[in-house]
Amino acid sequence: MNIDLNADVGEGCASDSELLTLVSSANIACGFHAGDAQTMLTSVREALKNGVAIGAHPSFPDRDNFGRTAMALPPETVYAQTLYQIGALGAIVQAQGSVMRHVKPHGMLYNQAAKDPHLAQAIAKAVHDYDPSLILVGLAGSELIRAGERHRLVTRQEVFADRGYQADGSLVPRMQPGALIHDEEQALAQTLDMVQAGRVKSVTGVWTTVTAQTVCIHGDGEYALAFARRLRAAFNARNIHVIA
C-alpha cells in the first residue's frame, strides 16, 4: 500500500531541510501568510534536491495571524488571490526546470473551504484555470474535494496526524479543547488507524469513516522531526510505501 506524506514548508521553521528528507510532498507558503520570494526559491530548490513533489500553499492575506483569521471574502477575490499565489510559485518552479504537482490551501482558507461550497468552488476553479493537471489537496470528505471533482481535477484526500477530529469528520477548531494532539503515541495510533483502517476516533469517542490519501505533518510542531521519523519507521514496518 502507498501513502503520501506532506509537510508545510517555507513558513520560517528551521527544521524544513531535515523534514524534506522524510516527506514525499511539500506545500510551500506563497507569501500571503508566511514566506517571500526568497524563501519560496530556497524551498523549491531544497524540495528538488530531495526528490519531493512541490505544491503551492495559498492562504488568506493574513501575515499577522499566520493565515488563521476567518475572512468573509467574495469568491471572486479568493479566486484571484489563489491564482496569484499559485502563479508566483509556479514561475519559480518553472525557472528551476521543474513542474508544480499540487495545491493545498492553508489555515483558515483550508478550513472554510472544507465547509463553504462557494469558497471551495473559487479555489478549485483557480487551480483548474491555472493548470488542470494539478492535484487539489483538501480535507478528506470536504466541500473542497467535491469542488475539485466537479472541475474534474485529480483530488487527494488529506488526514492530519496531530489534529483532533469531530464526529462529522471535520477538524476540531484550534481554539477548542482536543484540537491538537501532543502525545506522540496517540498521534501515531490515530495515523495508522486512518491509513490502514480508514477510520478516525472523534473527540466525542465516535468512530468516523475517513479516506486517507495523504498525511500532513506540521513542520512547526515541536516534535515534528522526531514524529516524522517514527511515522516513517511505522510505515516501513507495515509495508506502507511513502510516495507522492
UniProtKB/Swiss-Prot annotation:
GO terms for biological process: carbohydrate metabolic process. The keyword Manganese does not apply. Gene3D superfamilies: Glycoside hydrolase/deacetylase. Its EC number is 3.5.2.9. The keyword Nucleotide-binding applies. It catalyses: 5-oxo-L-proline + ATP + 2 H2O = L-glutamate + ADP + phosphate + H(+). Keywords: ATP-binding, Hydrolase, Nucleotide-binding. It is an enzyme of class 3 (hydrolase). GO terms for molecular function: 5-oxoprolinase (ATP-hydrolyzing) activity; ATP binding. It holds the Pfam family LamB_YcsF. Forms a complex composed of PxpA, PxpB and PxpC. Belongs to the LamB/PxpA family. Catalyzes the cleavage of 5-oxoproline to form L-glutamate coupled to the hydrolysis of ATP to ADP and inorganic phosphate. This is 5-oxoprolinase subunit A. It comes from Salmonella dublin (strain CT_02021853).
